[in-house]
From Swiss-Prot:
This is tRNA (guanine(37)-N(1))-methyltransferase. GO terms for biological process: mitochondrial tRNA methylation; tRNA N1-guanine methylation. The keyword Transferase applies. Its EC number is 2.1.1.228. The gene is TRM5.
Length: 457
């Protein structure tokens, strides 16, 4: 990659050092330019005047005005050209009338000047430059790579570049092509930086803490997280079957939703509970560590027997809560009547409005757990479900050439596992392409009453 600024080539030099380790001293370049000698009080004329616009040096990270090493108290205004004949006439006229003349000056660029991408393009063998890794996912302080095989011999140098060229990065890891089959998280190797994998990641106005080596997290799904959260209404209850560390559950809780959040991975469950507390939603987001099928089957009766607090409006800040607490203490101390909190006046929430099933590899296989979900329920509980919950099920399909075929494939598999036909209240959302022959979708459907009130599986 070549970066050019009129008359000057600022691209890094051809790398001639070792390829087993990075020789930073090989990255040095001297750019001879002209400089205008001026008194400090006249610098503004040269920087702000129209005459100099096409002549001034405009290289990123290089100052246009420097001290004159030969004339104490004077300044040098650097130009972008090395030859006087290249200076525009209007600029040359200003230089002749308002300066102490021209002088030569060397602009020195070194390893610190160029970006990681520019250094890498110079460092790699020519046949590997096209398609070289140029991006990475950030999770907290961790830069997460997925290097192709041909770049593995240079993985530690790539890691070093990313670490040194990005201030937010403290740890660089590369995904190894194996995945924990039970809990979905990827194995990874440290390329550079600290072996510190407990991150604090911000998404959807929430703060998430987790060990990146022990739980599943995919930053590419933040748009999908936000999309579904917008569907939920604050007064509703959401049952998150495969909640992970809470990318759906915690923002839904902050919105005001009651949430039953479940994950089979003990580490995910641990951080899910921590994140609920850290985001001050642990009163309405309840964490569980169960098999997804078991969680679905228990969810309706669990909420009926242990309702979540009623929605009482937007959550107060810590400062507002503290002011209210002191006000109530003052009323009590003065012997006045202390008002009953709104949450205690209202009945708790006892009906699930949404089930979220974000386990695209196998979520469809859990849908049979909805069979007979409400069979045998007492009349009062059955009345709560005069309108069935919505189910949002993420899945993969190999039907990538046609949206119609993709939706048909997903619908067929869902209906087979549910044991009943879907209603007209069914929609499909394309999430992303994960491979050349594999797309991710979310199917949202109203749970058919004949499934929920039918025989248990």
């Amino acid at each position: 990659m070549t970066t050019r600024h009129l008359y000057l080539d600022t691209s890094p030099p051809a790398y001639t050092g070792s390829r087993t380790e990075l020789d930073k001293s090989a990255f040095h370049k001297t750019l001879p330019v002209l400089a205008v000698r001026v008194r400090p009080e006249k610098v503004g004329k040269f920087l702000k005047g129209d005459a100099m616009k096409r002549a001034l040096l405009d290289i990123p990270k290089v100052r246009t005005v420097v001290s004159d090493p030969k004339e104490e108290g004077n300044r040098l205004v650097l130009l972008r050209m090395p030859n006087e004949g290249d200076i525009p006439p209007e600029a040359l006229e200003l230089i002749k009338t308002e300066s102490n003349g021209l002088t030569e000056f060397n602009v020195n660029l070194d390893y610190n000047y160029w970006t990681a991408d520019e250094i890498l393009q110079s460092f790699l063998p020519e046949e590997l430059r096209e398609g070289a890794p140029s991006g990475f996912a950030m999770v907290g302080h961790i830069a997460h790579l997925n290097l192709n095989e041909e770049y593995l011999p240079y993985k530690y140098i790539i890691g070093q570049l990313i670490l040194e060229k990005n201030n937010r990065v403290r740890t660089v890891v590369n995904k190894i092509n194996s995945i924990d089959t039970q809990f979905r998280f990827f194995k990874m190797e440290l390329l550079a930086g600290e072996p510190d994998y407990v991150v604090e990641h911000h998404e959807s106005d929430c703060r998430f803490m987790f060990d990146f080596t022990k739980v599943y997290w995919n930053s590419r799904l933040h748009t999908e997280h936000d999309r579904l959260i917008q569907v939920f209404q604050p007064e509703e209850v959401v049952a998150d079957v495969f909640a992970g560390v809470g990318p759906f559950a915690i923002p839904a809780g902050k919105k005001g939703c009651g949430v039953l959040a479940n994950d089979l991975n003990p580490e995910s469950y641990k951080y899910l509970a921590i994140n609920a507390k850290n985001n001050r939603v642990d009163d309405t987001v309840k964490a569980f560590c169960e098999d997804g099928r078991e969680f679905i089957q228990k969810s309706v009766s669990r909420l009926w027997e242990e309702p979540l607090p009623a929605y009482t409006g937007p959550k107060q800040s810590r400062v507002q809560e503290e002011k209210e607490r002191r006000r109530l203490q003052r009323l009590k101390a003065e012997g006045q009547t202390v008002p009953i909190p709104p949450s205690e006046k209202q009945h708790g929430r006892r009906r699930i409005s949404h089930f979220v099933m974000n386990l695209p590899d196998s979520a469809i296989s859990f849908l049979d757990a909805f069979r007979g979900l409400l069979s045998g329920a007492e009349p009062a509980l059955r009345e709560q479900y005069s309108t069935m919950p919505m189910v949002h099920c993420h899945c993969f399909t190999r039907e990538v050439d046609s949206r119609v075929n993709a939706e048909g494939d997903i619908r067929k598999r869902v209906e087979e596992k549910l044991g009943g036909a879907l209603t007209s209240e069914t929609s499909f959302h394309f999430v992303r392409s994960v491979a050349p022959n594999k797309d991710m979708y979310c199917i949202s459907f109203r749970l058919p009453p004949e499934v929920a009130f039918g025989e248990r599986m």
